[in-house]
Amino acid sequence: MSQDILTEASKTKKGLRRQIDERGRELAYLQRKCRELGIPVLVVVEGLSAAGKGTIINQMIQPLDPRGFKVSCIASPNRDEQLRPFLWRFWRRTPSANRMAIFDRSWYRNLLDAEISGELNESELRKAYTDVRAFERQLREGGTTILKFFLRITKKEQAVRLATLQGNPATAWRVSDAVLARHARYKDYQKAVDHMFEETDLEEEAPWRRIDSKNLSNATFEALGYLVDALRKRVEQCKAGNPLFEGKRLTGLPCFSDAPSLKKSDLSLGLEKEAYREIIQARQSRIQELHNELYRLRIPLVIVYEGWDASGKGGNIRRLTEQMDPRGYEVIPVSAPNDVEKAHHYLWRFWTEFPKAGHVTIF
């Protein structure tokens, strides 16, 4: 975004409004092109309370076809989400091809709060950020365009805006005790935000765009500029036949399994029927015990079956689950993806079926 253009446009409110409207028209055009080319777009808008996230998002979507986007406002996870992997609820909201997903707060808000509260120690926080980078990289490798905005305001400006909200009966509810507590720890949050940038502001991946939002009109103009530039670049890449993902893909990953290769597997019968019945009954009883233990300790388990047609997957699953509590497991048959699944990232349909804590999912 050219600072000269922003400065010139800022000279008059009318001039800036014209520039914003022009950006909006271009954004609407690019939305149509992304839809035609099947480009999924994910936009993250983060910032401290009263930084103007809602205003910026509202200005983003005004020129867009409302059938082509969805805004997700991320609050604290509900009971069901708490029982799932951290990124589960965000995977479910990732955009399909030709649609745009806009997040008012995101997976980052959880990590900022967890760092401030001490809910996650240094090692756990490092792992969480590793998971976030992998999540974003997987989406990018699948063709998703990701833009991340962070709106900055000073503590003084935040205090003024919070007071204004509190003074209006229609908006006072937005200033909760949690919001005031975050404001009181402004410096701690700034430190956590800087740590977030260190972990996830990678120019080759999905860089952060930091925007001063003291003047919301200027901030809107700047955010629209970044969004238009990114979508224009992606559309041009697609038209030129270039791959959507430009980074280096991970290759040559080591195999951590000690399982023998199929060529070396012994497929001959090794047990007589009586011995088999005795062993399987003992092992099914043990599986029942372990299933109860998984539930007690709130440990989720995913079991994956692969094999040729008629190789015995169904029979094996039936024996596996014979003594398991049916309320604690689910079998997910996997076939060719349908049209909805094809329009999403390859892993989307599997993430949506991940088990709750203490439950078992068998694919």
Question: Which residues does each predicted region cover?
Answer:
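Glycine-rich phosphate-binding loop of ATP-dependent small-molecule kinases
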Residues: 1-363
